[in-house]
């Protein structure tokens, strides 16, 4: 296991300040949302924790209007996946990418698709070699993707620990 310390982007630093103000005051408008209901007010720290988890991964999980950033986690992850892909290209090395946040959902912005976009557009990795386990709707499709990985036709697969295994 290798841990990487990725400093917050400027937008994340700004949002951290807002999140601390929200946690102290309960004023949800600071975060750009409607005032909290009575029930939500009792759970404001859970709301703050949820926002913090999303913010830590990618600001666009909070609001898709936030900017991409060259130093966000999606960019770092894509760069590292591409480096490994190139380093082990001769062996058709494969990679499992685990995240239980920002998982693939067709038709909406998600971290999996964003990293794939970066891998294809920025690093020239063929789209056909990158898959999401969530695309597999049954065991037969799942087995086909795993077989393609074992053969080196799929080189990168994304999934949550519950969908892809424990890592």
Name each region found by the language model:
Residues 60-61, 104-108, 165-167:
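Short catalytic/ligand-binding loop motif for oxyanion handling, primarily in non-cytosolic enzymes
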Residues 66-78, 107-112:
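Phosphate/oxyanion-binding active-site loops and adjacent basic polyanion-contact surfaces
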Residues 90-92, 153-154:
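Short, high-confidence coil segments that cap the C-terminus of an alpha-helix
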Residues 101-134:
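Conserved helicase motor "Helicase C" RecA-like lobe of SF1/SF2 P-loop NTPases
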Residues 124-164:
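Conserved helicase ATPase core of P-loop NTP-dependent helicases/translocases
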């Amino acid at each position: 296991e290798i841990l990487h310390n990725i400093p917050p982007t400027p937008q994340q630093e700004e949002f951290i300040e807002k999140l601390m103000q929200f946690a102290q005051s309960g004023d949800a408008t600071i975060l750009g949302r409607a005032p909290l209901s009575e029930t939500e007010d009792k759970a404001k720290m859970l709301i703050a924790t949820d926002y913090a988890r999303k913010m830590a991964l990618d600001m666009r999980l909070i609001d898709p209007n936030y900017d991409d950033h060259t130093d966000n986690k999606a960019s770092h992850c894509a760069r590292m996946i591409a480096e490994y892909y190139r380093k082990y290209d001769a062996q058709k090395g494969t990679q499992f990418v685990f995240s239980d946040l920002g998982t693939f959902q067709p038709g909406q912005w998600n971290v999996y698709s964003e990293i794939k976009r970066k891998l294809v557009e920025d690093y020239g990795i063929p789209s056909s070699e990158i898959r999401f386990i969530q695309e597999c709707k049954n065991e037969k499709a799942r087995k086909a993707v795993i077989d393609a990985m074992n053969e080196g036709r799929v080189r990168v697969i994304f999934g949550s620990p519950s969908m892809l295994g424990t890592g």
